UniProtKB/Swiss-Prot annotation:
Protein known as: Olfactory receptor 6S1
Keyword Membrane: yes
Organism annotation: Homo sapiens
A GO cellular component annotation in the UniProt record: plasma membrane
Primary location recorded for the protein, binned into one broad class: membrane
Transmembrane segments: 30-50, 60-80, 100-120, 148-168, 208-228, 243-263, 275-295
Database matches in Pfam families: 7tm_4
Function per UniProt: Odorant receptor.
Length: 331
């Protein structure tokens, strides 16, 4: 018996509510979200591949961009495959272990992404404001350590809240999580105990990660603006700003939706609104990232064109070789 008088149990599974207002269009939703997921994977895998393959992109900015694409691939893969399977299933269940795992990786990868976005902002500041010292400050070893710190910085702080949620007493088997994945707020509402302290802890951790990384980003771009405005030529100012525009678009989308969802003590707001904002964070932003960076960056576009030329040339070469070998075999 829980402190508030409700019977608690050790759950073996939950039910994900999904998108109940759109249940009549499950097949259409499956098709749309599958297409979005495949485009997301394709775009981000291309970014990772071209950054590793093209020597022109062996710079700190593109190294961090490759890490960002890896995070986007993992973040969407934590949520979308289960969501797609539920669209085609009558039972929208998820095991307790899978739910807690999804909870952990969603927040771990999200926190790492915030930290990485802040690092990318600081990297742009150093490149624009300290160009002579930049190669020394952002050497390959430094970039590797900073990227590793971003991954570990997301991995460790989320462990405590995840264990705390896993140990909570829940009121009944098969309780409905009012979301399409195991998010913090909907899970805590199913507990048979007072979760106020845990909610406050989640709020503090989310605020620390989001606000601190946002502060680094804001300060970096504030200093960049001051430095760029001091450049006498208009073409010089435009070139300096062009290197930051893509990152600013991504930062605006990501921070705006995350602050709305998690930097609120009570995690209030209508369920439909929270779902809509989560869709932007989980589906739209990762989908747009490769296109934002690729379409606005001449170096990435040229590298992608070269990679496609090599792939096409390789495929045609293999086809011609197979044809020649088959003709010789016939003769």
């Amino acid at each position: 018996m829980s402190p508030d008088g409700n019977h608690s149990s050790d759950p073996t599974e939950f039910v994900l509510a999904g998108l109940p207002n759109l249940n009549s269009a499950r097949v259409e939703l499956f098709s749309v979200f599958l297409l979005v997921y495949l485009l997301n994977l394709t775009g981000n895998v291309l970014i990772v591949g071209v950054v590793r393959a093209d020597t022109r992109l062996q710079t700190p900015m593109y190294f961090f961009l490759g890490n960002l694409s890896c995070l986007e691939i993992l973040l969407t893969s934590v949520i979308i495959p289960k969501m797609l399977s539920n669209f085609l299933s009558r039972q929208h269940t998820i095991s307790f272990a899978a739910c807690i795992t999804q909870f952990y990786f969603y927040f771990f990868l999200g926190a790492s992404e915030f930290l990485l976005l802040a690092v990318m902002s600081a990297d742009r500041y150093l490149a624009i404001c300290h160009p002579l010292r930049y190669p020394l400050l952002m050497s390959g070893a430094v970039c590797f350590r900073v990227a590793l710190a971003c991954w570990v910085g997301g991995l460790v702080p989320v462990l405590g809240p995840t264990v705390a949620v896993a140990l909570l007493p829940f009121c009944k088997q098969g309780a409905v999580v009012q979301h399409f994945f195991c998010d913090s707020g909907p899970l805590l509402r199913l507990a048979c105990t007072n979760t106020k302290k845990l909610e406050e802890t989640d709020f503090v951790l989310a605020s620390l990660v989001i606000v601190s990384s946002l502060l680094i980003t804001a300060v970096s771009y504030g200093l960049i603006v001051l430095a760029v405005l001091s450049i006498p030529s208009a073409s010089g100012r435009q070139k300096a700003f062009s290197t930051c525009t893509s990152h600013l678009i991504v930062v605006t989308l990501f921070y705006g939706s995350a602050i709305f969802l998690y930097v609120r003590p009570s995690q209030s707001g209508s369920v439909d609104t929270n779902w809509a904002v989560t869709v932007i964070t989980t589906f739209v932003t990762p989908l747009l990232n490769p296109f934002i960076y690729a379409l606005r960056n001449e170096q990435v576009k040229e590298a992608l064109k070269d990679m496609f030329r090599k792939v096409v040339a390789g495929v045609l070469g293999n086809l011609l070789l197979d044809k020649c070998l088959s003709e010789k075999a016939v003769k």
